[in-house]
């Protein structure tokens, strides 16, 4: 199943913190290291970016943006245990961060830890009931576990939230096909093709 990955390098780590006008108590060294990490990530120098984000985290262990950005890079470099560790630390800092649960779920799914992934997507949805990507990702993990009925429920909810996303129809079509529901699969594939034009 194709992933719709909110992390997938729309370079969602382009969060910059200005070194100017920082609130009192902010570690300026951590801010500088973070900004250098963003700069290196923008140049696609990911190993250097990780090094700077790691420095920012060393100087400020609760630097949520550095943890987030480093976790994204680890995910995209297929270093999933490290990505899971960063997203787990991020959840420890902000247990209401629905994106961190979704992102950790993706890292679990890439390791074929689908039960853990589903638990994280479920938490993300609990925190943000309109989180289309989390429904889609949970559907992908349910599909991987051959829980086709659950996958259909999640893809259908995702389609309700974003009826213009061809990928969602294609995912549901593959699931209908796996269930032997060829007519429903064909209908969804046709809708997906129309939307993809």
Walk through the language-model features, giving the residues of each.
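Alpha-helical tetratricopeptide repeat
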Residues: 2-197
């Amino acid at each position: 199943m194709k992933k719709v990955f909110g992390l997938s390098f729309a370079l969602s780590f382009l969060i910059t913190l200005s070194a100017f006008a920082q609130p009192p108590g902010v570690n300026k060294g951590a801010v500088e290291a973070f900004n250098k990490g963003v700069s290196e990530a923008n140049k696609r120098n990911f190993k250097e970016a990780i090094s700077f984000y790691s420095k920012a985290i060393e100087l400020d262990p609760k630097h949520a943006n550095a943890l987030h950005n480093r976790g994204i890079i680890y995910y995209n470099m297929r270093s999933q245990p490290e990505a899971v560790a960063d997203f787990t630390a991020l959840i420890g800092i902000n247990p209401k961060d629905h994106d961190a649960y979704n992102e950790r779920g993706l890292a679990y799914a890439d390791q074929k830890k689908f039960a853990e992934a589903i638990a994280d997507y479920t938490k993300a949805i609990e925190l943000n009931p309109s989180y289309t990507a989390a429904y889609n990702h949970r559907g992908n993990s349910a599909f991987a576990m051959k829980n086709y009925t659950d996958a259909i429920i999640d893809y259908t909810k995702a389609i309700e939230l974003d009826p213009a996303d061809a990928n969602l129809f294609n995912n549901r079509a593959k699931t209908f096909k796996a269930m032997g529901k060829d007519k429903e699969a064909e209908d969804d594939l046709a809708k997906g093709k129309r939307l993809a034009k």
